């Protein structure tokens, strides 16, 4: 007979005396990642490889609360501190193609310097350039040019008037043009009456000569216009010469300050050239022209094109930047080009370009959240393009998606120099590998964070330092004494479901740390003890166990049928785990088996009702294999049996109840009652070995609570797979009940051990002839199967005899003459 488990195997207990501190306040806070050696090595590799093709980006995989973000920030801060600061990034006006602003990269801190230099320089030029036009030399040379062209202009006009008089016309200037008037013989202009009184042939002659005069005037006016243009050109060239002479030294000085920065020098040259070519804004002191409309019109700033838009200022950076983007929308990643509305029209310019995370992280590291990034398909597709092209391009999202949009700026793309780190689940990683062919090419490093680590003395001491770190980071968290640390370590072991492991789900641990500190404060304690941790865990269970308590109430009141006393054949208490968010609990269920003569074999009622999953169906098929090997070596199995989870109305899956179902079948076949004070969990293989399952602690505790609610008898307990013993981390109440003999836990390795414990009857072993003793469970099963076989055989024989009798009677009836056969009139 199987012996129940010893108390010391039901739960790992951490000894507070193994810690040599008074409270965690005496410890150095943990400043490193523990239990994630594999992931740490992957991070070192990914951060250490500098690939010009941007293929060694990192995907950090793992469950929530495993310290992924903390580890990434820790390593990135160390790695970035040893790297040089990236350059500042600026955008400036493109004087050749204004809709394509140019980028400029400068050493860290010099972007703002360049902006300030240009602001001050333009302000100085706005004051100094007008003075160039007020100088005596400029005025004298301008006067000389004006006089030279004025004389030529006067000469041309005099020639025009003289030739007009020779043709018999005089010229009259008006505000709207020039009139030609015919002259009389006396040299006076003809009046309209005098002209009308002339003979027709005389008038025709005047009109002919008038056409010649107008052509003459047109020719001379064109020459005058050319003279005016030449004068304006000379004046402009003089102005350019004067301004260039004035501003060149200051621009040369700027070139000297930015020597070696080719893009800056190009911009300085372009600004100098544009100022010289467009002096009107400076001559008018930058004042807007008077609007021709009766209301004020917005005017463009003529000096904005000489400013510098600093997108990224790395003057205060220590090493390479580390940017964490929690909301990876397209504008947040790639930046945006803002617009403002004037008179109903959206306008923009280079000064309205705003940076994205990629710009701020350029030359360093960008950390993204996978759940957020991959919900935003546009962001992911654009990011892949940026990595492959190795450039950061700001585009209109509507245009990128193929929708029509107003043509706007297309800033020159910036070189892409970023190491990407995406943090997400292993599930997303597998999906990307399967469905996105680019992902594997661009993310060659996977840092896989596990949920557990080995429970060693070193890790237990590190856990104490982790609690010290929690206290230092959270003012509301009190220090833990050794008993409190021990309870937290036990809880960390409990989370893993393995006595040899500690949980790496630090998020879950921190929640209990804060709650335990809260309960300590309510008792006016200056530190957290083991009792406070226990209370925090109990209070959390109380907040979450409403459904669990309701199910126990229904079992206690008899609404749900679960027996915890007595015996019954073909009926076993199975155990399942229900997961309600972050709270899991065990629920006992009655499993019954009904056996009768027939050829239906093993019928799974859950499967027939379409309430059973594939894994559960597999477990039922395994039962058929076990029964066939044990009891069908000499004759086929000739019985029908049905299995059911009683009062189950939802989907059932998993094979953890397959051993329980097998016990129910064996009990029904052997007609041996099973102890109802025992519950069973564990899967079984075709050889009868009981295999480990999940949720063993919740299942045991769930049945214990039901037994406690209905009344503990001292005979109650749970059969678990022997392979699950190392997974036991039962609550202290259950451990105490086992210690006092009120409850029991039995490790089962084979079906034989389990059926013997449940029925109190030996399972039985085959003798030399291959038969089981009649007074054993298997012997009784064989007897029942033989009985059913004989019954089926007799039934089949009777069916054959009845069939033969029916056939004989039919033949005899066919041989007799009928009245119709004797009818002489029948042809």
Predicted regions and their residues:
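Peripheral, non-AAA+ core regions of ATP-driven protein-machinery
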Residues: 16, 349-358, 364-377, 381-383, ...
């Amino acid at each position: 007979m199987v012996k129940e488990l010893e108390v010391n195997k039901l739960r790992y207990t951490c000894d507070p005396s193994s810690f040599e501190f008074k409270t965690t306040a005496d410890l150095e806070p943990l400043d490193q990642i523990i239990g994630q050696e594999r992931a740490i090595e992957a991070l070192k590799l990914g951060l250490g490889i500098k690939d010009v093709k941007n293929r060694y980006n990192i995907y950090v995989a793992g469950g929530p609360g495993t310290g992924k973000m903390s580890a990434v920030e820790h390593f990135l801060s160390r790695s970035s501190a040893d790297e040089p600061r990236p350059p500042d990034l600026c955008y400036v006006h493109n004087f050749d193609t204004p809709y394509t602003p140019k980028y400029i990269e400068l050493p860290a801190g010099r972007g703002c310097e360049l902006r300030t230099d240009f602001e001050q320089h333009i302000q100085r030029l706005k004051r100094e350039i007008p003075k160039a036009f007020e100088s005596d030399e400029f005025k004298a040379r301008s006067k000389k040019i004006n006089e030279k062209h004025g004389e030529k202009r006067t000469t041309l006009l005099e020639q025009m008037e003289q030739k007009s008089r020779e043709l018999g016309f005089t010229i009259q200037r008006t505000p709207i043009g020039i009139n030609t008037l015919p002259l009389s013989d006396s040299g006076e202009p003809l009046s309209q009456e005098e002209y009308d009184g002339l003979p027709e042939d005389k008038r025709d002659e005047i009109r002919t000569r008038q056409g010649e005069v107008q052509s003459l005037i047109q020719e001379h006016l064109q020459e005058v216009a050319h003279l005016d243009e030449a004068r304006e050109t000379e004046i402009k060239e003089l102005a350019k010469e004067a301004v260039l002479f004035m501003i060149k030294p200051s621009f040369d000085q700027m070139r000297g300050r930015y020597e070696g920065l080719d893009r800056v020098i190009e911009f300085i040259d372009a600004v100098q050239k544009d100022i010289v070519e467009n002096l009107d804004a400076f001559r008018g002191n930058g004042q807007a022209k008077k609007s021709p409309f009766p209301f004020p019109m917005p005017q463009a700033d003529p000096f904005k094109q000489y400013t510098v838009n600093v997108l990224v200022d790395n003057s205060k950076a220590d090493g390479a930047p580390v940017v964490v983007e929690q909301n990876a929308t397209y504008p947040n990643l790639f930046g945006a080009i803002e617009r403002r509305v004037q008179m109903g029209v959206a306008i923009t310019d280079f000064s309205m370009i705003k940076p994205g995370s990629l710009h701020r992280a350029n030359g360093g590291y960008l950390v993204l959240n996978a759940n957020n990034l991959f919900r935003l398909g546009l962001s992911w597709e654009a990011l892949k393009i940026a990595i492959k092209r190795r450039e950061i391009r700001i585009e209109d999202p509507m245009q990128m998606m193929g929708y029509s949009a107003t043509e706007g700026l297309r800033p020159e793309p910036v070189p892409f120099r970023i190491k990407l780190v995406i943090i997400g689940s292993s599930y997303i990683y597998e999906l990307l590998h399967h469905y996105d062919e680019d992902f594997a090419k661009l993310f060659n490093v996977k840092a896989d964070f596990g949920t557990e680590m080995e429970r060693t003395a070193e890790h237990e001491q590190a856990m104490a330092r982790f609690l010290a770190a929690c206290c230092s980071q959270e003012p509301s968290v009190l220090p833990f004494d050794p008993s409190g640390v021990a309870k937290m370590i036990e809880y960390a072991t409990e989370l893993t479901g393995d006595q040899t492991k500690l949980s790496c789900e630090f998020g879950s641990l921190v929640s209990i740390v804060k709650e335990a500190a809260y309960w300590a404060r309510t008792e006016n304690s200056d530190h957290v003890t083991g009792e406070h941790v226990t209370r925090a865990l109990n209070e959390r269970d109380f907040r979450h166990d409403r459904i669990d308590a309701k199910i126990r109430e229904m079992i206690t009141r008899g609404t749900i049928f679960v027996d915890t006393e007595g015996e019954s054949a073909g009926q076993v208490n199975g155990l399942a785990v229900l997961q309600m968010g972050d709270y899991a609990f065990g629920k006992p269920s009655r499993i019954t088996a009904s056996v009768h003569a027939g050829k239906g074999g093993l019928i799974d009622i859950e499967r027939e009702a379409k309430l059973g999953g594939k894994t559960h169906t597999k477990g039922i098929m395994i039962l058929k294999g076990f029964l066939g090997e044990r009891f069908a070596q000499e004759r086929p199995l000739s019985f029908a049996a049905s299995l059911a989870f009683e009062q189950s109305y939802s989907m059932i899956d998993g094979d953890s109840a397959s051993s329980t179902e097998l016990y129910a079948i064996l009990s029904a076949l052997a007609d041996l009652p099973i102890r109802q004070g025992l519950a069973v969990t564990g899967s079984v293989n075709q050889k009868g070995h009981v295999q480990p399952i999940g949720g063993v602690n919740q299942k045991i505790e769930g049945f214990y609570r039901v037994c406690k609610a209905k009344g503990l008898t001292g005979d109650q307990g749970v059969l678990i797979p022997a392979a699950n013993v190392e997974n036991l981390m039962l609550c202290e109440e259950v451990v105490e009940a086992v210690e006092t003999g009120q409850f029991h836990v039995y490790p089962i390795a084979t079906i034989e051990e389990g059926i013997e414990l449940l029925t109190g009857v030996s399972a039985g072993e085959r003798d030399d002839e291959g038969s089981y003793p009649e007074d054993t469970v298997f012997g009784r099963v064989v007897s029942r199967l033989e009985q059913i076989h004989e019954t089926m055989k007799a039934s089949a024989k009777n069916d054959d005899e009845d069939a033969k009798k029916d056939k004989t009677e039919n033949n005899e009836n066919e041989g007799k003459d009928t009245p119709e056969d004797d009818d002489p009139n029948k042809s």
